[in-house]
Structures are given as structure tokens and as C-alpha cells.
From Swiss-Prot:
This is Alpha/beta hydrolase domain-containing protein 17A. Its EC number is 3.1.2.22. Palmitoylated on cysteine residues located in a cysteine cluster at the N-terminus which promotes membrane localization. Palmitoylation is required for post-synaptic localization and for depalmitoylating activity towards DLG4/PSD95. Its main location: membrane. Keywords: Cell membrane, Cell projection, Endosome, Hydrolase, Lipoprotein, Membrane, Palmitate, Phosphoprotein, Postsynaptic cell membrane, Synapse.
Amino acid sequence: MNGLSLSELCCLFCCPPCPGRIAAKLAFLPPEATYSLVPEPEPGPGGAGAAPLGTLRASSGAPGRWKLHLTERADFQYSQRELDTIEVFPTKSARGNRVSCMYVRCVPGARYTVLFSHGNAVDLGQMSSFYIGLGSRLHCNIFSYDYSGYGASSGRPSERNLYADIDAAWQALRTRYGISPDSIILYGQSIGTVPTVDLASRYECAAVVLHSPLTSGMRVAFPDTKKTYCFDAFPNIEKVSKITSPVLIIHGTEDEVIDFSHGLALYERCPKAVEPLWVEGAGHNDIELYSQYLERLRRFISQELPSQRA
């Protein structure tokens, strides 16, 4: 019955877990923070000198000047020049959490900005080098954020917070930088595909990339599950059909964390999916090392988006 054993079904229906508990057990492993956001006082009306710290309006997430301080654990691979291209600031989610945001200006006048939702067990500090390299190679700017409880973001990680966090990032990207939806590519990796699919199912954008995606929390915990239960967490499989933007799905055939079958199932359920990238022999965390990864992304962005075909 739906791929679950009798004992598993009895356990589920007699003591069904809530989505939050499934999410917490399956997904969230925030690392020790590898960075901090340091407020920089702005000049007062008289020019020299600093305005009171309150003028930074950090609690509201309004524009202010912030400096990125990386620890050694961030393992930054570039020079101070590249570090200076990174802008950081906090914003606030609808659930009241401070959400740390990062904007990497890789290419002057870039046509697209990638809103990147990263995977598990990393934060913005650890991802900063990757963002610089990816944006430079794709000729896109990169905007990212940390989930509640990750990096310098406050609160605790949860499914509901994931959705509020990406909403806050989306609004910050649009209002602070004036980026229109048709210039935003939503990119989710692993657990980051959860907020990405949710946002893409509600807003149209230039494109969507799902990198090592999961279909749902229950299907990760119980691989034979065929049905989405009311207590399931991260139900990407039920939302992906609502996406109206072009979707590129990328998955490694030897993924040891989220089985390759998840990528296949989402591809089959998504009417806006383009030709996927199945990376033969790749696992969960090494797809970026294969040459076809960048090749497929470049072709998707340069040739397959509606604005490029016009």
C-alpha cells in the first residue's frame, strides 16, 4: 500500500509526525557561523563623523552599510578585490527573524541575477567563493541569503521559516536593487530546492534551477512512499506543477543523500521542465566538478529562456 510496510503505516497513522518534526530530523544542520555582519557608521549630515548607530536601521532591514567579516572556516579563495564586490546586509522576515543577505556583483550590467538558496550544513561565508566563481562563469550576479538559524540569521530553522526567509530575500532583491522578476533566476540546491519551488510556484520569474532536489521529506525518509500525506514536509512534488517559468533539473545518478529518483519524479511532474541534466556517476555534493554542469547552465541561460529566444 503506497510502498510502505504494514508496520510503517501503523506507526505513521497511530503516531503521525508533524511536518516540523520531519523537517527538523531530515534537513537542518546549521554549521558554526563562518562570518558576521559588521555595521559601518555612515557620515552624519555635517560630513565628517559618524551618525548614531540607529541610523543604520538594522532591525528593519532598511538600507545601511555593512561589512562582511569572514572567519578562517569560510576558506575564502579570492583576493580582497573580489571580497570588495560582495555586499551584505540584514533584512527581516514576516516571521520576525533577521535574515542575512549577500549580493555578489560579478558582471557589470548583467542581464540576470541568480537568487541562490544553498544546501545544508553551509552558510553564506562558506558559499561566498563559489558564488563569485559561478557568477563570473555564467555572467550573472548572485544574490543569496541564510536560512533562519544559519550564519548570522536569527531564529531557528524550520519549514515555515524557509518560506518566510526566501520571501524576505525576494523582496529585498526587488526593492533594494530594483531587479524585476523577469531578470531573476531562482536556483535551489538540495534543501534549498524547497523554498525555491515554493516561491516559484507563487511568482513568475526568468527561470528556475533545481539542483539535487527532493520530492518530499517523507519520500527521503521512506523511499518507497508514493503518496503525499497531510503530515509530509517539503512537498515539492505537489508544487512543482504550479511553476510557470522554465525549469532546469540537475541530479547526479549516484546521489547518496537524495536519490536520483527524486529528480526524475520532479521532471516528470513539471510541465515547464526543459531538457534535464543527469550527471552520470555524480553524487550529492560534487556535481559542480563535472564539466557538463557549467555547460548545461550556460546553454540554459543563453539559449533557452524566453527573453533569449525573442
